[in-house]
Curated annotation (Swiss-Prot):
It is found in: Host nucleus. The keyword Kinase does not apply. Functions as a docking protein to recruit essential components of the viral replication machinery to viral DNA origins. In the presence of the major DNA-binding protein, opens dsDNA leading to a conformational change in the origin that facilitates DNA unwinding and subsequent replication. It comes from Psittacid herpesvirus 1 (isolate Amazon parrot/-/97-0001/1997). Belongs to the herpesviridae OriBP family. This is Replication origin-binding protein. Transmembrane segments: none annotated. One of its GO terms (cellular component) is host cell nucleus. SMART domains: DEXDc. InterPro entries: Helicase_ATP-bd, P-loop_NTPase, Replication_origin-bd. GO terms for biological process: DNA replication. One of its GO terms (molecular function) is ATP binding. Homodimer. Interacts with the major DNA-binding protein. Interacts with the DNA helicase/primase complex-associated protein and the polymerase accessory protein. Gene3D superfamilies: P-loop containing nucleotide triphosphate hydrolases.
Amino acid sequence: MCSETGTGVPERNGCADSFSPSVMIARKLYGCDLCERLLTNPRMAGMSLDRQHGHPITFPLPIRTKPVLVARAPMGSGKTTALIDWLTAFLDSEDKSAVIVSCRRSFTNSLSRRFQRDGLTGFTTYLDSDQYVLTEAAHRRLLVQLESLQRISDSLLDRYDVLVVDEVMSIVAQFFSPTMRRLRLVDSMFTSLLRRCRHVIAMDATVNATLVELLAELRGAENVHVVVSDFVSRGFANRECVVMSSLGAALPASMVRYAPPAGDESREASASQPPPHDSSNEPCAPEITDADIESTEGSFFHELHVRLLQGENVCVFSSTLAFSRIVAFFCAEVLSPDAVLLLNSTSPPVDTSDWSRYKVVVYTTVVTVGLSFDDSHFHTMFAFVKPSIHGPDMMAVYQAMGRVRSLIRDRLFMYMDVSSANEGPTFTPMLLNAEIGSATAWPPEILIPANTMCLRFKDRCSSALLDHHRALFSRFKTKHYLERSTLTSANDSFSLLHTLLANNKIAVRMRGDRPDAPASAILVEDFGRFLSRLRTDAFSNRRFLRRITYAIEEAASAMRERVALRNPTAEETVMMLAENQAARSCMERFFGLRGAVDDYGEPIIALMKDMGDVPLVAARLVNAAVIEAGCACSAGEWYVVDLAAEHASHGSSEFDKWMNYYLDEPLVSLKRGRPEEVQIPIQPGIRGRTALLRACVNVARQIGWRPTTWNDDAELEAADVERAMATAIEAGLGKFALEYMRLNFTEPSWLTGPIRNLQRFLGARKRHAAHGIGPSEQRKESPEICIFRTLWAELFGVRILKSQRTFPGTTRVKNLRKEHLKALLDRIEVRYPESSTHKQLYGLLRENQYRFSNSPKLLLRTPDWMRQLSGNRPQAEQAP
């Protein structure tokens, strides 16, 4: 065991110094450079550092432990065992107390069972109490979830002897969760515990220097002891992750018995990521050919199929709900439904102790920190990871993948679907994978622009959410923004996940195009090509995934009919809505209707169904209602509202009152024909939301778009959109989008030649004609249009298409009257004799039609329910 103190500064080996911001940022984020950073920080003088190697992590005896003990060690290193040993020794008398803070209810229950099993008695959980306020009498040894800290009485909060924070980085991430209520109070109480408890123990596999430095500020560096262990159990030490370059979805698609109608699209596709080609011309239910099946050899599904037929037990992780159903369907077809356990947000929980009863376990991020499967039951693991704006971040993916502690074959097959990582010019990769190569391995033409993007991101983060000054939230907001905003980049997401896997001593290799090719280490020069292959493959598999999804939905519908699970009729649904007070209130606020039976037309019913299936739709309803209210104002009225909101304190402006009017009461959705209330989470960044929506109102007013009156056949001049967006970007649109949407837009002024080269190299944007995927239209558009497309899609669910019409308007030019033909010629400044006939004017217009193509136009496809909005605003308070 090596023990050293922070007073000495070791010689640098050049490794950390050689890292540029873009190369080092992932390692810094997850504490891979923790020892070097602490030992070279003068402010950490007096801190003690204990490096352990070759054995499970151990803690010093309680009598020799400094007030703050920080333990950084990989998954499977024995952190929980060391904690129990420490607590057993410390809690040697009944008068000593402890509070253990967790990030999830499942983690609390799991830790409670582990304590009981190992003889650590006397602990209660916040779930055991009938009283809301937890008092000293029964809860001096308490396991509590972070959000429930507010239930602890003040007298009890100040008297705990030891605070334990297992999975401390997950606790930190919880401060940014949309489920976090009373953020400032919880932040204050947690910080108070960190300051006042006699002992603090913080543990995690990814403890970073930011956390240790924060604890040193709160308690003094001389009171901090850091234990860093590189030990991992055999289950991780010998594990190898093979990144597949093909999914092979044609294999499960060949097993389905239902065919989707032509043009049916996966619900998972984001509105901001339209299909790469028009699927409406595809034949209904395209046949799966022998060539399609042959092409799956060596793919994700091929490897899974082989192992199932060989009788192996397999666990499968999926980062999306939709794919978890697809892979569970496939495994059930190969084996039997009874052999497969599916765990996702729509299925009941099953204790990990029961997993060994199944040949296949498929799970999503519902299985995360605090839940582990330790038995040597599974031979192989498969993982499907899809980075997307609304999906789990790579830390959540890594945590979920690590729940299975032992694999008999020590092999993990991973496929990354990068079809939703919609990069340049809207988004730019900025992380260079340190596990592939150091700064010197990356060419300067990639390294320099990547560093530039990192520095701009840091500047944008530093100015975001300035009204949140609490210690924990403000200190870790950049980490949170980085983990969320990088989900738009295949390169950045893979680089973060690669760093996390390497942190746990898992070797990562990639498989090439040839099925018989061995997995090889990833090289810098091959990385861009590999990302490009992944994108090509992801798009080519879309039609197969749509086919399987449709089949699963049809089979589920047939099953419900067989077991007589009858949903209400349309008339019964409307009657239930008309009798529901929350539904009537919702109808009045958003649509200006009483909520009577006749008010529930098809667009509103469809909206409520969508809110039941896709929670994001509820936020879009609020956003669109606020935009409609802003667009309904006169020019003078909006000028006053906008100016006042810009200079008012947070929450006090008229515009803030509009937001509160729509957010204060629950919305109502329909789940299987029955009304359910939907609470809109008030997450950190609400100030960013109001600022972003104000900017959108200004853009909408400038281009003439209004939700209730917009004609989908109307064309919008791209030049008008570009001017409006340029003004919004200059006013801070990028910062507002980062605060609320967690998106890091690349501003048009940043798009220099080197930045575009970076996008081409790491953007995974190449397409393959063999799969019917032509060049992306988005690449031909200006960056302002690309940002506009993403904003309107994500905020309002509006699809934006490039108009294919040669001439303005929806009427065929041949059918126009002479005065209309003359108006079109005047518009492009083409002279004509006043005595010209209709035929002559038409011919002259056709000769000059190329002049119209120089002015591209857009079509906005607005959801039908938007036309029902009332644009209501809260009534002004009457003066006494």
